[in-house]
Amino acid sequence: MKFRCPGALAVGTGFIKDYELLFKGSKTGSYLTIEEKKGSSVPVAIWKVDENHERALDRYEGYPSFYYKKEIEIDFISLKRKLPHRAKAFVYIMHEDRCLGIPSKGYLQVCLEGYKTFGFSCKYLEDALKNSMEVKHGNNNK
């Protein structure tokens, strides 16, 4: 984010409930997305962005052809004061017709670094990768 959106501010962390983390994509690569799944959750960083940041993110994420945006209400803990908050936010979600896939080592490393920066368990990424590997080897029907 600091490279794509200079001036954007990380304000908190939280969880998107009833969604799971997945690696999906196309022939050019597999990337993170979320899909609905009751009982699951996905850790997220909450960023304060302006309209210019949002336009830059739209271009970077391939909106609206690769990802679409969804507005959600999310509970989160502020980074500065560690207080609970609730806010409207937007998330990028890859179109559901994309297939599960295995990300590049470089992309996975960037994701791991982001998770570590915000203190998230890497188990979410490991589970998403395991799910993709099972599909590649025919052990899953997603």
What are these regions (language model features)?
Residues 1-142:
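Glycine-aromatic micro-motifs
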